[in-house]
Amino acid sequence: MVVLFIISFYTNNQEIASPPVAFFAPFSLAAIDLIYNVDKWRVELKNNTYLIMLVGSLCFLGAVYFARAGKVFLRSGRFEQNRFKSTIEPEELNYIKVGRINCWIFAALQVITFVLCLIAVMRISRRFGISGSLSILISGYKNLKSFTTENISLGRLNNNLYDFCYASGFIWFYIVANNFAVSKKVDKLPLLNLILSIAISLEKGSRGGAVTLLVAGVAMMVIIWQKKSKRRRLKFRQILLVILIAVIVVGTFQKVGELLGRVSAADFGGYLSTYLSAPIRNLDYYINNVMGRSFSRPDVWGKMTFVRMINFLGGFLKIDSWVYELDLPFLRSNGYVCGNVYTTFYAYLYDFGVTGVIVLMILMGLISQVLYQKATKPSKRNRRYSINLWIIVYSYVFYSLAFSFFSNKFYEGIVSIQFMKYLVFWAMVRYFVERTKFKAVSFKRI
């Protein structure tokens, strides 16, 4: 993984937001961290594991290069010698002026949503006999979501408001990043709305939404900086800022979990390794101790890979067998907890075997590279709006690629009704921000 990261980094002109770098950089960190835990967990990866990860990774990388070469061919009618040149095209960025009234109206909506959802979470937790502090109630709701078949929905209105406000966070992050790149100043009201979106994402007890938004935001910042500065490579101080943001996110990960009621007995290093390198160890266990002994196709096609869409269709069509929990057993090694995540390869192997790894990794590479090229290319359609939705869409995909070392984020996230809702919500918020104007009302003395 480290070698593939180095190759992809330099053949992609050191564009750190490109799909191969997004995929291989975190996987490389996970592999390095696994070396640190070899004795602790008594890890001895088998050749089967190495081979499956290598084949899948090469399929992904090959698909990315094919998509890049295809872009060159479609433009010129022939393959150029330098087919790996930068896909980032410079663009004159405009300061996105958001009306103060627009910002305050949206902030008020988010505060109302925060209160409504928090009341609903507390009420549901107490209904199931959970009592205590706010963090205990939120943690209790998270556990109910994970381990009960009872209806614990916040209600259609609350859920839609929750999703809408969370999705708006991507727009607000884009505005903050764009305006900072243009003016070197932080736009305070959009930043306030961004903070509210992050706060709302934590109400259900999960840190995943906040992490998604922050990682996607970093991708937006990088692409916007590169387009604005007309540089393929980031300046050293910009790279340091990206690293600093990553360190802050990682450093506060356990503490945020504790605030949400998720207490762990492990030290910070062990806690982090459970999320970072344990998935590779768990994948090795599955390949050589479960799959190697008795592999059988699941009862539902694409059960693990397309779980979000299948669950939605099952509920919508009233097909009980399509509503299920993921098959992710918790594992331990040498007495240490290794969690229940198995990298992105697990879902493909579980559903379709080695053939699934090859086909789905190729599709992942093609889709992500095409979206990256859309995000980094100026479009005439984008001139109607200052906010480029392609950058936001790719930033969401960037997160799913970056967390492939963890689980099947790509197909879970993209092939889902939730992603379709986000597309609609992003368009709605963009219209509200850029096209809806309010005039201040003045009251004159009669």
Briefly describe each language-model feature range:
Residues 1-123, 428:
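A structural signal for hydrophobic alpha-helical transmembrane segments in multi-pass membrane proteins
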Residues 1-3, 54-75, 166-175, 214-220, ...:
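Hydrophobic cores of alpha-helical transmembrane segments in multi-pass inner/ER membrane proteins
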Residues 2-8, 166-181, 359-377:
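Hydrophobic, aromatic-rich transmembrane alpha-helices
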Residues 7-8, 13-17, 41-43, 205, ...:
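Conserved luminal/periplasmic juxtamembrane motif of membrane-embedded glycan-processing enzymes
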Residues 13-18, 174-190, 374-392:
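Membrane-interface helix-loop-helix junctions at transmembrane boundaries of multi-pass membrane enzymes
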Residues 75-234, 238-239, 246-260, 443-446:
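Membrane-embedded catalytic interface detector for glycan/lipid assembly enzymes
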Residues 135-159, 248-368:
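Small-residue-enriched transmembrane helix-hairpin modules in multi-pass membrane proteins
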Residues 340-446:
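Hydrophobic alpha-helical segments
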